[in-house]
Amino acid sequence: MSANLPPHHRMSSFSSVVFLTLITSGLAFAEDWGAYSIAPASAPGMVLEAAGAKVTIGKSSGAANQKWFVIAKDGEFCVIQPARDPSLWLAASGGGSKNGTPLVLEAASGAPSQLWNLKKLDNGNYNLIPQQAPEMGLDDFAGGKTPGSRIDLWTNKAGDQHLEWKVTALAGISAPPPAAQEAGSNYAPVEIKPEEIRRGAIKEFKFVQSKFFPGTTRDVTIFIPAQYDGTKPACVYLKTDGYKPAEKELLETMIATKEMPVTIGVFVKPGSLPPPKKGTLDRRNRCFEYDGVSDNNVRFFVEELLPYVAREYGLNLSNDGNDRCISGGSSGGITAFTAAWHQPEAFSRVYAASGSWVAFRGGNEFPTLVRKFEARPIRAFLTTATHDMENAAGDWFLLDQEMDKSLQFSGYDYQFRIVDGRHVAGYVEHWREAMAFLWKGWPERVKAGPSAPRAQEIIIPGEGWQLAAEGFKSTRGPACNAKGEVFFADTTANKIHRINLEGKVDEFVADSGQAHCVTIDADGKLYTISEKSGKLMSYDENGAGTVVLDGLTGHSILATSGAGLYVTSNGDKPNAPATVWFIKDGKKTKVDSGLKFATGMAIRPDQWLLSVADGHSKWIYSYQINQDGTLADKERFFPLHVADWDDDAGAESICYSLEGRQFAATRSGIQISADDGPTQVILPVPDRSRVTGVCLGGSNGDTLFAFCGNKIWKRKVQQHAVGAFSPWTKVNATKL
């Protein structure tokens, strides 16, 4: 690796070479492990592909000729191999070094024209530079956007998107390509004369009024810049762990150079609960407030501290997260990121030095959460130290690098620095660089990245959540019919509603017997079950009801393609085991018991596996469906994410997509599982409320609905509805 690269990149390069070499021979078992997609920044949706010995671009399809191995070779250079035939290497034809030299695949020789330097840019893209022509780069000629477009060498020019490439790990790895150069610190402080730096004012007070952390007291310092006049909302810089004079000078300098907008600083220490008698230890709240991964601290900042500061000091503070930055080191670093994570609308810019992503209070799970949750509009500048802290909670140096890799994996706009030193080394030294990066382009809004690869298979760029309807007393147990109409129960209001193909909600049944869930069979007939009435009802297309079975209370109901119904029931005795029933021809048969609290159900598109959610655990169970409707081969199969402050995932409703993905409505949002069990994607709704129902529907079957108490959210996705009306459909294995 290049001598100027941070140590972790030098080490990871060696391990990547070994790893990639080993997995090449096992391609049939894990086709994407270690492989990358190389896509032109100038042609979204296109990727580099091998067409015989020729190299061109094609529409992304996941084909083998669009997958590449990137393997470190000599110093800062690497070789790029097509995954379908690693004996060939990407090369400049004939060793050419002129504009227009075509790119080809050649038998490996180690020639300079086969060695490439991958230089990472500030925007996350890469220049691919051949060893024999360092002034040239891999070029999407004229920004071609059609399959078969010419790929050649061209003179490198900063900002030319034709020469920029997105290099994305497909599976198994999330680190940068092994020979990629970090952009590193190219920040040059803006020079300014000392007399041009205007000095701001400092105010100090103790805050003792917290309801989130009752009884605590804490020191707070306010910095008011000389440029502040109150005529418009000022930006906010919130610093955890209190005030240091150096940051006042840094703020004054950055505001004077206009690298930061006019910004009011709020420096707050963690709270402590004083003991009733002197001579003993107080209750130190720092770990509780800072290392906890709930939203308590950000709510304290947003609902208590900042309004108090604005009110008591007559300050016009912006409430927009795009105008706010939050900063800290160690536990103060993780709480800064946690604040932005829970409320990016309150803080969208984060500086965290030696962040404590360790197992104090669940912070060690953050790298995984960043990979699974849909990316959020957060820009971050993170650092770690070569001799960082290590204790029973974990190794800061390793876990900080895990956060680095996770943020890259999910496409976040961020920078990461490894600093020579100990815990929180370089915080002040990197402060100006961090602020320049975090505030670049302001007031342009910080945008969310593209999310992780598996999420990109579900969501559609630019198609976020929209409020579909609101004002209900409850929304439960949704289902769609073959046309794409979606039905759901408002149990509290004793109604069943329909979302028609125009997206409008109308009343379908005025008196539903407190139906708790609906389902629709292959013929379009709607069925309901109730936890109160004890009646299993059917309704025709006009909403006329008929009692199918009396004496059965149930949580959820599901129609099969074979004229049968499954019902989950939890009885009326506390802690009694739940039951799954199969109903056919008016008769009920107990087919399973033992779950803590059985809730939603779904049948896979190939119609032989039934999923049943346990709402009082983190599990969804899987069963084989026998021909007579009985169940066999029960496994606690799908683990769901449980937030640190929750006791269970709270799965209420589940459904499948035609493509074979399982969607679960949970406390954390909609969790989407791979066919073999793991949760790969989590889609929270905009107000972060619990999702109690999930369904795919709409005229094309590609609208995802999330039911959340009194609201319903919707968004277009790359998945499609399936139900009892659907034919048997083959399910393919989900990528890792």
Named regions from a protein language model:
Residues 30-175:
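Lectin-like carbohydrate-binding module/patch detector with strong preference for beta-trefoil
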Residues 176-447:
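Non-catalytic cap/lid and distal C-terminal segments of serine-dependent acyl enzymes
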Residues 448-464, 579:
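Blade/loop signatures of beta-propeller domains
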Residues 464-469, 504-509, 544-549, 587-593, ...:
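A short beta-strand motif characteristic of beta-propeller blades
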Residues 470-485, 511-530, 534-535, 551-579, ...:
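Beta-rich, blade/repeat-based domains predominating
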Residues 491, 531, 570-572, 615, ...:
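Short loop/turn segments immediately following the C-termini of beta-strands
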Residues 695-736:
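Blade-level signature of beta-propeller repeat domains, shared across WD40, Kelch, NHL, RCC1
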